[in-house]
């Protein structure tokens, strides 16, 4: 078999991510050294990120019957690697004083990132399942990494049990699709469905049931209503850096799969897309209303995440109607990645594994501006962006989602987005106001002078700067959005 340089370049990012996990494993076996393992992970993930550049210039390459490397997979792989690198930088500060083994954290994270990249490249249901499991299994260990804390162990058990249930739905849905179509290749499934006689209602019904079960499986990963019940407890119990990963990388990978799946497979029945619309509607409304009631920052951001992916479902429903919807998804996910990394990054920088819990209760942030003004400014920018305030990237993202809803006459969903944004504005501004309240006897400063020079501090500040700069001048990001478009099936 001859060496194929095109295939090698196309798969180099995935190979480097997998090799990073192997290198970390060998380093742990040879000698436990937290600093060394951290640098191996950072170098490996950065190498994988930069290796995406030559892969993006190539035409779509079908590497195996399971994986395809195109501009779409390259774009979402870049988001996955950026989110993984952000988690690593936050984890280093959090793990410095961790009383138990620290190196395995980077091994589990590298394995989960490998699974997420497999999902971004998958165009076969078997590859999707492999990617989901390769990402999910390490996350069980990461969620329960602070195993001496009861909340962390409880969160890990809940996530494991409910994730196994979601996997069962996903597998059963894949089995029903295969039984009706006779293939697991996404493109073949789309072609076969388009040729099915509409008169064969039994075939269409079973296909809808199969696709519905796939949506249930992915709905759990995206914490959509009514599959969101795990989110507040797991977000609250998991270590702060792991919560960052759960909220960003794992959800971006799943949504990339959903978009490819429903763009390739034609609409089989209007009822199915009405069902997706219903999921979007209740996720937006209930997610925002539940966030309104929270006094814990992690739980608030967890329910807020449910609402944000409800907004994204609006664009997903219209994905076959025009390129604007795909651009809206890509832009909104970039915004969501930067703002979530920044907001959870602040929680991570405020937390310590020696504490009984992370610094996630809102009273812990009362008057934070008078103690840590720069950190508070970064957090304020993140929440203003999540609320969709002008001059931030969040405003551009919300504008694109509303434009999709209006252009394709999704009026009831557009109304839900407007209502959800209004409710979100209230609870985001409530958190911001708490940051600036001053109480008598409060110390003027309690932060070290060099916190912003640490890797985690630098990452939070960089995210805040990008959110503002891209909110004022989004053209560089808009120029990249065509990369995130799928080819017409």
UniProtKB/Swiss-Prot annotation:
Subcellular location per the Swiss-Prot or TrEMBL entry: Cell inner membrane
Membrane topology: Multi-pass membrane protein
Transmembrane segment boundaries: 6-26, 37-57, 66-86, 105-125, 127-147, 159-179, 204-224, 239-259, 271-291, 299-319, 329-349, 377-397, 408-430, 452-472
Coiled-coil regions, chain positions: none
Keywords per UniProt: Cell inner membrane, Cell membrane, Membrane, NAD, Quinone, Translocase, Transmembrane, Transmembrane helix, Transport, Ubiquinone
Catalysed reactions listed for this entry: a quinone + NADH + 5 H(+)(in) = a quinol + NAD(+) + 4 H(+)(out)
InterPro entries assigned to the protein according to its UniProt record, in alphabetical order: NADH-Q_OxRdtase_suN/2, ND/Mrp_TM
UniProt-listed Pfam families: Proton_antipo_M (PF00361)
Any one Gene Ontology cellular component term annotated for this protein: plasma membrane
EC number(s) recorded for this UniProt protein: 7.1.1.-
Subunit-structure text: NDH-1 is composed of 14 different subunits. Subunits NuoA, H, J, K, L, M, N constitute the membrane sector of the complex.
Protein family (similarity comment): Belongs to the complex I subunit 2 family.
NCBIfam families: NDH_I_N (TIGR01770), PRK05777.1-1 (NF004439)
UniProt function note: NDH-1 shuttles electrons from NADH, via FMN and iron-sulfur (Fe-S) centers, to quinones in the respiratory chain. The immediate electron acceptor for the enzyme in this species is believed to be ubiquinone. Couples the redox reaction to proton translocation (for every two electrons transferred, four hydrogen ions are translocated across the cytoplasmic membrane), and thus conserves the redox energy in a proton gradient.
Protein name in UniProt: NADH-quinone oxidoreductase subunit N
Organism, as annotated: Tolumonas auensis (strain DSM 9187 / NBRC 110442 / TA 4)
Top-level taxonomy: Bacteria, Pseudomonadati, Pseudomonadota, Gammaproteobacteria, Aeromonadales
